[in-house]
Amino acid sequence: MKRRSFLIQSALALPSLDLIAKSLFVDPWTIKMLNKTTGIFSERGGTILFKFTKNGIVVIDSQFPDQADHLISELKKQNEKPFELLINTHHHGDHTGGNIKFKGLVNRVLAHTNSKANQMRVATANKTEANQLFPNQTFDSVWSEKIGKDRITLHYYGAGHTNGDSIIHLEKDNIIHMGDLMFNRRHPNVDRSS
């Protein structure tokens, strides 16, 4: 290869190397604040909703263990309060797999009664009980509590995506988290095994 040709080709390739290098060091997750105290975390699987309150941090869903580590690390950078409550919208692993990373960090894990039973059934069948943090608080129809300045209410309207889906309403923010009852740009899925 002639020197002139080499220099031209190298000069043309240089900008693409910069893009490749930047893409290798970009965090694989995103955090988007919806307002001053409420945001969403996305990486792999479902969307995690979090709320900073004067009492502590409320987290809805936990994705998988690696993603939960990223979430916990990022939330600790933004807020010094402890984790107050972890809510699971339903039992699937992309919503509860990261629960184990909250062990020792959060005192309360909340889900619908059927969701807890389903999570326990699947973990027992797969022999993964040691990798789980199961809900220690459940509800059947409606659960509501004022946490900080916001009231958080969970509703169960019957079987949908699973037989244990919760709809979570952050009343002051007027934000609803529906887990996998609502999909973006695709048809919903019904898990007939639950």
Predicted stretch roles:
Residues 29-73, 166-170, 174-180:
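Conserved beta-strand hairpin/beta-sheet module of binuclear metal-dependent hydrolase folds
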Residues 61-68, 92-95, 132, 194:
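Solvent-exposed, acidic/flexible segments
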Residues 33, 42, 102-103, 130-132, ...:
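Extracellular/periplasmic catalytic domains that process cell-envelope and extracellular macromolecules
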Residues 76-144:
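Active-site HxH/HxHxD metal-binding segment of metal-dependent hydrolases
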Residues 3-23:
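N-terminal export signals
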Residues 67, 91-97, 116-119, 162-164, ...:
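Active-site environment of divalent metal-dependent phosphoester hydrolases
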Residues 56-57, 64-65, 144, 151, ...:
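Metallo-beta-lactamase
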Residues 30-38, 123-127, 148-153:
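Short Pro/Gly-enriched beta-strand edge/turn motifs at strand-loop
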